[in-house]
Amino acid sequence: HEEGDASAGTAPPAPGSNGETIVEKLDVNISAAQGLLYAFDSLYISVNGPGSGLYRARDTNGDDQFDEVTKLRSLDGAGEHGPHALRLSPDGKSIYIVCGNHTNPTEFSSTRLPANWGEDLLLPRQWDARGHARGRLAPGGWIAKVDPEGKNWELVSAGYRNSYSIDFNADGELFAYDSDM
């Protein structure tokens, strides 16, 4: 997982200009961030490590500094296959979070998928010979849609090994790339 400080920056006004790039350390007690999204006057942070979960940092007094950091939801997962990217929904009203297959599903308010995960195999299972992800069963990695307050979570897609990020096309269709192996 990634360690380090959260930073914010202002890029020069145009490529090749002499404008100054300004970078400042943010005073938020967060590490191991794998996903960042600024939306709804808040910085949302997907933490993949100690304290894994979805966090929200806000400036509540208008001084241009984050003075409130709230853990919206704990997520049971960490490491290279834990919580990852955050994206704004195509309609701009909610957040999508991507979690790898070592992140257990959280409690969902609703789901677009059947909840009766099946491990029915025609042939005997062949676990990874190197031992990776042995015992990790369906639904695998998953993608959820979350309201800005972090209260309502809808499972929208699952079955991934370790998708790190997603995006949407102009029609609002979701695209994911299943990383590794």
PLM regions: where:
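Beta-propeller domains with acidic blade repeats across secreted/periplasmic ectodomains
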Residues: 1-181
